[in-house]
């Protein structure tokens, strides 16, 4: 009887102690220093509108028109594009999002030379609005 209780105790302890590992989101692939980068356009509605135009031109193909990572190119990619409406992406700092847009994240290309710093911040501001529209 003691062996059965010990087995059950170990089984449940192991099962429940490792469950959190699988449910935790992966770390965003930006360096910790990216969190300190401050958004100079935060809360600017004009920049959000400009960001949407840039997003449509450069991001929709992979991330989809609502930012869910379901664009027309997504099925052919080696890993699914980020869902910009997700709590995981929305919980990242503006600096981390800016860093990813700038540096890229394979297979996502870098936009450091394609977009100006202002344009990259505009995209960050637009991504922030996607959480509010994800249920529509």
Language-model features: where?
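C-terminal capping alpha-helices of c-type cytochrome domains
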Residues: 99-102, 106, 112-136
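Sequence/structural segment immediately N-terminal to covalent heme-attachment motifs in c-type
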Residues: 45-68, 74, 102-103
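Bacterial N-terminal signal peptides that target proteins for export
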Residues: 1-8
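Hydrophobic packing within well-folded, soluble alpha/beta domains
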Residues: 59-62, 97, 123
């Amino acid at each position: 009887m003691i062996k059965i209780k010990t087995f059950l105790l170990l089984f449940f302890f192991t099962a429940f102690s490792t469950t959190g590992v699988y449910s935790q989101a992966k770390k965003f692939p930006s360096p910790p220093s990216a969190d300190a980068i401050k958004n100079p356009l935060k809360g600017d509605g004009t920049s959000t509108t400009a960001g949407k135009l840039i997003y449509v031109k450069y991001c929709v193909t992979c991330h989809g028109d609502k930012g869910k990572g379901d664009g027309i190119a997504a099925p052919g990619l080696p890993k699914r594009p980020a869902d910009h409406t997700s709590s995981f992406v929305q919980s990242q700092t503006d600096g981390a999002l800016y860093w990813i847009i700038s540096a890229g994240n394979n297979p996502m290309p870098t936009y450091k030379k394609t977009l100006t710093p202002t344009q990259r911040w505009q995209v960050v501001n637009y991504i922030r609005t996607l959480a509010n529209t994800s249920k529509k």
